[in-house]
């Protein structure tokens, strides 16, 4: 038997360019519509689990209704908290720009002021992932979540170094993207990742 995990990143948000971690900003109408375009690929899903942040939860509720599935939320699927710079438009950041630049160059070495460390974020997400794959709860699970969460899961599945800046600088997880991970249920199975 194979287990499918569809990782959906929320659509584009209603806000200026910024690091939106724990800031609970709404998804834009166009972003929601773009995410909803995946609903046919999700047919046959057995459950939907969403980040509790409204940019994910709004679309997850609509998907759950369309697919006639129960929706649950998991705080562990929330984006990394970016501390004092969370939700601040980039155009408004002046004095703290060097801190932001250092974070972008090496996020595992430079935690933003008041932020969740990358190590804590990684441990939170990977802990959730390990629990959910140990008890799949059906053969097709949809996770509506955030770009950072998806990167952490991909790094775990592929055995990549989650501290490497390349994971954050070179792996693009677009808004409203669908990443499908298939795990076969036998000891020597190799996970397969598809970007749809």
Which positions does each model-derived feature cover?
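Glycine-rich phosphate-binding loop signature in dinucleotide/nucleotide-binding domains
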Residues: 42-44, 132-139
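Generic beta-sheet signal
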Residues: 5, 137-148
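Active-site-proximal alpha-helix that buttresses catalytic centers in soluble enzyme cores
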Residues: 4, 8-69
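Short beta-strand scaffold positions
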Residues: 50-51, 123, 144-145
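GST superfamily/GST-like fold recognition
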Residues: 147-151, 177
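Phosphate-handling substructures
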Residues: 65-127
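Acidic, low-complexity terminal tails and accessory targeting/binding regions
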Residues: 1-4, 80-92, 137, 155-196
């Amino acid at each position: 038997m194979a287990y499918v995990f569809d990782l959906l990143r929320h659509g584009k948000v209603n806000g200026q360019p910024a690091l939106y971690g724990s800031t609970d900003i709404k998804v834009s109408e166009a972003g929601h519509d773009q995410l909803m375009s995946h609903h046919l690929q999700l047919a046959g899903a057995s459950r939907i689990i969403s980040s509790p942040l409204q940019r994910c939860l709004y679309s997850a509720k609509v998907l759950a209704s369309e697919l006639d599935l129960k929706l649950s939320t998991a705080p562990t699927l929330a984006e990394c908290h970016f501390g004092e710079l969370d939700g601040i438009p980039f155009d408004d950041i002046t004095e703290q720009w060097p801190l932001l630049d250092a974070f972008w160059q090496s996020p595992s070495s430079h935690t933003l002021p008041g932020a969740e460390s990358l190590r804590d974020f990684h441990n939170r997400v990977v802990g959730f992932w390990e629990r959910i794959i140990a008890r799949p709860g059906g053969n097709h699970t949809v996770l509506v979540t955030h770009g950072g969460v998806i990167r952490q899961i991909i790094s775990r599945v592929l055995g990549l170094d989650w501290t490497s800046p390349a994971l954050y600088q070179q792996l693009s997880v677009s808004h409203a993207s669908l990443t499908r991970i298939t795990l076969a249920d036998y000891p020597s199975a190799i996970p397969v990742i598809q970007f749809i």
